[in-house]
Structures are given as structure tokens and as C-alpha cells.
């Protein structure tokens, strides 16, 4: 028989940097989850992701206070800031003020990383999705309609 689920916790934690301090500790403590055990397993699971990138995680908490979790890829806006804007933030007025240029190759690279979490049917649709996010951040997009 399957374990009874008592709740889900959605957090965004920096890859490889989970620790018991807020927001992780209080969120898990409310559900009676072993915080140290979660932090160790999360840091192990995210060792392939660049350290410090915010990584969404969905934690499933069971009635016997055990847990399982699924890590997602970092948000597209974070990846665009990292690869295209080199750490700068997006534009406050994206339609009038452009803060950078993204090539099709950069968008394709980000789309390949995000493919498991996107609902896009193929790579081309994923590229268009990432291009839309880039435009909304004030980034000029080249090579994508």
C-alpha cells in the first residue's frame, strides 16, 4: 500500500547550499521532516547544478514524516540573467529600454536545459518560450520571430 501524503512543500533553494536556516528549516519543521537529512540529500542531488543557482524543489511529506523531493531546473529568467546579461538585472521598462541581446544559440542552449520542465512540444517551441521570457525582461532577441 502507498504511503499517505500529508502535504507538499514548494521551495526555491540555491543549488548545493541548503541549510536549516530560513526558509528551509521553518517550512520543513512545520511538517515534522528531518531537516538535516533533507539538506544533505538536496545538496547531493544538486551537485551537478552550478552552485548558487536558485533551484525549485517540490517536497512530498508522508504521514510517517518521511519525504521525497523532485528538483526542477533553475527558472528561465535566472538563466537568461546568467548567460545573456552576465549578472545584470532585466529592464524596468522592457518595451522601451533594452538591456542586452540574446542570440538564437544562447536561447537554444537555455531551452535545452529547460526542456524537462517545459510543456513545449519540441525544441523550437521551447526556444520561442524562452525568447518570450527574454523579451519580457527587456532583452533583444535575434533569430527568433
Curated annotation (Swiss-Prot):
It comes from the Bacteria. SUPFAM superfamilies: Ribosomal L11/L12e N-terminal domain, Ribosomal protein L11, C-terminal domain. CDD domains: Ribosomal_L11. InterPro entries: Ribosomal_uL11, Ribosomal_uL11_bac-typ, Ribosomal_uL11_C, Ribosomal_uL11_C_sf, Ribosomal_uL11_CS, Ribosomal_uL11_N, Ribosomal_uL11_N_sf. GO terms for molecular function: large ribosomal subunit rRNA binding; structural constituent of ribosome. Keywords: Methylation, Ribonucleoprotein, Ribosomal protein, RNA-binding, rRNA-binding. GO terms for biological process: translation. Pfam families: Ribosomal_L11 (PF00298), Ribosomal_L11_N (PF03946). One of its GO terms (cellular component) is cytosolic large ribosomal subunit. Transmembrane segments: none annotated. One or more lysine residues are methylated. Part of the ribosomal stalk of the 50S ribosomal subunit. Interacts with L10 and the large rRNA to form the base of the stalk. L10 forms an elongated spine to which L12 dimers bind in a sequential fashion forming a multimeric L10(L12)X complex. Forms part of the ribosomal stalk which helps the ribosome interact with GTP-bound translation factors. Belongs to the universal ribosomal protein uL11 family. This is Large ribosomal subunit protein uL11. The gene is rplK.
Amino acid at each position: 500500500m502507498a504511503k499517505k501524503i500529508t502535504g507538499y512543500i514548494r521551495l526555491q533553494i540555491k543549488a548545493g547550499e541548503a541549510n536549516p536556516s530560513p526558509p528551509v528549516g521553518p517550512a520543513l519543521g512545520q511538517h515534522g521532516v528531518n531537516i538535516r537529512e533533507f539538506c544533505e540529500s538536496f545538496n547531493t542531488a544538486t551537485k551537478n547544478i552550478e552552485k548558487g543557482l536558485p533551484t525549485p524543489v517540490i517536497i512530498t511529506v508522508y504521514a510517517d514524516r518521511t519525504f521525497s523531493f523532485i528538483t526542477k531546473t533553475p527558472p528561465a529568467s535566472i538563466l537568461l540573467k546568467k548567460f545573456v546579461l552576465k549578472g545584470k538585472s532585466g529592464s524596468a521598462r522592457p518595451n522601451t529600454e533594452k538591456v542586452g541581446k540574446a542570440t538564437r544559440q544562447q536561447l537554444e542552449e537555455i531551452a535545452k536545459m529547460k526542456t524537462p520542465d517545459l510543456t513545449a512540444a519540441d525544441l523550437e517551441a521551447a526556444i520561442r518560450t524562452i525568447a518570450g521570457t527574454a523579451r519580457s525582461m527587456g532583452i533583444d532577441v535575434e533569430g527568433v520571430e
